[in-house]
Amino acid sequence: MLPNQNRLRRREDFAKVYAKGDRYRGTYLSLKILFDSNTTYTRIGIVVSKKVSKLAVTRNRFKRQLRAIFRQLLSQLKDGLQIVVTVTTVASKPNYQELGDDLKNILAKAKVLHGN
């Protein structure tokens, strides 16, 4: 699990990121990233719609895998970010490694990792 301070939960927060954030796309994921100078920590929300899979088991697996990947990357992310991750509809179901590689590539492209 992600720590409570790193979770994006409220509808208003998601709406703000969707409206004002910059979009970055990868093979399996789409990210909306908004820099918020008012916070000192990064907050993350994950969205997996029923278009990806009608089965809740599959949608929840994607969310668990992405939370685990973000937990490892949290120390490498810059502070004050609000990130909404959306799993895009895909013909093939990506495994954990493919999701991790795709997410790292998108974050590097967005220049939100330390050292970028």
Swiss-Prot record:
Output one GO MF annotation.
3'-tRNA processing endoribonuclease activity
Keywords from the named record: Endonuclease, Hydrolase, Nuclease, RNA-binding, tRNA processing
Might you give the EC number(s) for this enzyme?
A: 3.1.26.5
Which InterPro entries has this protein been placed in? Ribosomal_Su5_D2-typ_SF, Ribsml_uS5_D2-typ_fold_subgr, RNase_P, RNase_P_CS
Q: Which SUPFAM superfamilies match?
A: Ribosomal protein S5 domain 2-like (SSF54211)
* GO BP, one annotated term: tRNA 5'-leader removal
Q: Which GO terms describe its cellular component?
A: ribonuclease P complex
Its UniProt entry gives the catalysed reaction(s) as:
Endonucleolytic cleavage of RNA, removing 5'-extranucleotides from tRNA precursor
Against Pfam families, the record matches this protein to: Ribonuclease_P
What's the domain of life for this entry? Bacteria
Matching entries from NCBIfam families are given as: rnpA
**Similarity field:** Belongs to the RnpA family.
Q: What PANTHER family does this protein map onto?
A: RIBONUCLEASE P PROTEIN COMPONENT
Q: State whether it acts alone or in a complex, and with which partners, per the record.
A: Consists of a catalytic RNA component (M1 or rnpB) and a protein subunit.
Q: What is its biological role?
A: RNaseP catalyzes the removal of the 5'-leader sequence from pre-tRNA to produce the mature 5'-terminus. It can also cleave other RNA substrates such as 4.5S RNA. The protein component plays an auxiliary but essential role in vivo by binding to the 5'-leader sequence and broadening the substrate specificity of the ribozyme.
According to UniProt, the name of this protein is: Ribonuclease P protein component
| Protein's organism | Pseudanabaena sp. (strain PCC 6903)
Q: Coding gene?
A: rnpA
